Regions:
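Conserved catalytic cores of very large enzyme subunits
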Residues: 1-194, 211-489
Length: 489
């Protein structure tokens, strides 16, 4: 590990140990794939219900709502959890605690609804090969709850309160036009219900913070007050907003947030610059906030890592790398962690010293860093119809997928085995695992007199697999999933 030069302590050993035990006990067995089923330290019981009590309450509420629209069911169950979960404002942490984080809503929402969506999709398209593709290792088609990215720009400029106001204003405009549908009315009502519950939750956190007198309490209280009333004002406010949104979306509503900001450096930079210029916080204090923020994701232990990205290019061609980009790398290196994982958007305008810094970190042991070729991202998105500006500002998410900011929705997950179509060329479309015809009939391989014809047959097989695999999702899966979630992503 290459030592970075901080002449101040980023996080005390006591606080670090505390956060490392916030989500699960370090001295107990742990399965990262089941990370949300654990708890670390105990929360104040007076702040809310236990997990079991909340699950019993959800059972009772879901029973009352069983004949209601999915929008209504989801929004009411979501609100119930935020109203009743235990909370924490701790002397060892700058970030809030939410106790019930095991997606307990799933029993009544995602679990039954996705089965319903698959059944309806299969019925709509007839004899779908989706199950056979899965059994044979050819392809997998699933509803995707794991690759969402919220509109961080709107959240950073409006906050939770401003998003709700924008929703109400949009509703008023559509309502006054006389063109609003019954379904739109219901969607508005339920989306409003969820954002009101979220704001109420933040107000509950704020009220609880006022009962604390430890050194961090005043800073936490002021930040929560900002988020109760409007948009984030400081770097710390924005970090707290990102964290709260992440926990509520990922662990309550079951939509994984697969990027922390539109580039963590670029989302935070306006706040960072303002904080320094107006002397709200020093660089040292901001460094600590970022360190405590990163430690949350390290401590959660997500087995596939929590991503965020840095760098990139502005539409005018200038680099998006800034002072904070370097500082974030330094903090990450100093902490010696591998989760969250960092994606760096690189192109010709990326400063070489920034790339070399990341490379030195990798050589020194900070190996959870990947480089994403921005030129390829831009070309690929523009081929799909995106403008240059939109493609340049594309968000990197998940492993290292990319998408347009606030203009795309990733709700279907399709994975393909590129070798299977090759097998189908040799077998005439028959699968050697299931014994079924999963491809198409093509000529016997011995009849091909050129590689080009062989390759054309391969592409034909692959094209068939792709279209058969995505057909159920195109037919019904998307509509059903949108029926599940009134909270926009």
């Amino acid at each position: 590990m290459q030592e970075r030069f901080f002449n101040y302590e980023l996080i005390s050993d006591t606080d670090r140990s505390f956060i490392e035990n916030k989500y699960h006990r370090q001295d107990m067995p742990f399965d990262g794939k089941q990370r949300m089923k654990y708890h670390g330290y105990d929360y104040d019981e007076s702040t809310g219900l236990s997990d079991r009590e909340i699950m019993l309450g959800l059972d009772e509420l879901a029973k009352k709502l069983e004949n209601e629209h999915h929008y209504t069911i989801k929004s009411e169950l979501f609100s119930y959890i935020l109203d009743n979960t235990r909370i924490d404002i701790n002397e060892h942490d700058y970030f809030i605690g939410i106790y019930t984080w095991d997606r307990v809503i799933d029993k009544h929402t995602i679990d039954p609804w996705q089965k319903e969506a698959y059944a309806k999709a299969t019925l709509a398209v007839g004899n779908s090969k989706r199950n056979d593709f899965s059994k044979s290792g050819t392809a997998w088609a699933l509803l995707d709850f794991d690759h969402t990215v919220p509109d961080w720009e709107s959240l950073s400029t409006l906050g939770f309160v401003g998003i709700l106001e924008r929703l109400e204003n949009s509703y008023t405009v559509v309502k006054s036009s006389g063109s609003i549908t019954e379904k739109q009315e219901l969607f508005y009502k339920c989306a409003k219900r969820e954002y009101e519950a979220l704001i109420k939750f933040v107000k509950r956190l704020y009220a609880y913070s006022l009962t604390k007198s430890h050194p961090k309490a005043a800073i936490v209280s002021e930040s929560l007050k900002h988020l109760c009333e409007g948009a984030p004002q400081t770097t710390y406010d924005m970090l707290q907003l990102i964290y709260i949104y992440f926990m509520v979306s990922e662990s309550v509503e079951h939509y994984q947030v697969r990027s922390l900001g539109y580039g963590l450096d670029n989302t935070l930079y306006p706040f960072y610059k303002s904080d320094i210029e107006n002397r709200r916080f020093s660089k040292e204090e901001i460094s600590r906030f970022i360190a405590y923020f990163m430690m949350q994701f390290s401590a959660m232990g997500n087995y596939w890592g929590q991503p965020f990205y840095l760098g990139g290019t502005n539409p005018d061609g200038s680099t998006a790398v800034n002072e904070l980009s370097y500082l974030i790398l330094d903090i990450y290196d100093k902490l010696g962690i591998y989760n969250p994982k960092i994606q760096i958007k690189v192109c010709k305008s990326t400063p070489k010293d920034f790339v070399f810094k990341a490379l030195r970190m990798i050589i020194g042991g900070s190996t959870s860093i990947v480089f994403c070729n921005e030129d390829i991202i831009v070309k690929a998105l523009m081929r799909s119809g995106a403008t240059y500006d939109d493609a340049t500002l594309a968000v990197v998410k998940g492993c290292y997928e990319y998408a347009l900011r606030a203009k795309s929705i990733g709700i279907s997950f399709n994975t393909f085995n590129a070798l299977k179509p090759l097998c189908f060329v040799f077998s005439g479309g028959y699968d050697n695992v299931t014994g079924k015809l999963l491809g198409i009939h093509t000529k016997d391989v011995s009849e091909f007199d050129s590689f080009e014809k062989f390759y054309h047959a391969y592409l034909a097989q692959f094209d068939y697999v792709i279209n058969e695999n995505i057909l159920p999702g195109k037919s019904h899966g998307r509509r059903s999933l949108l029926g599940c979630s009134p909270w926009g992503h």
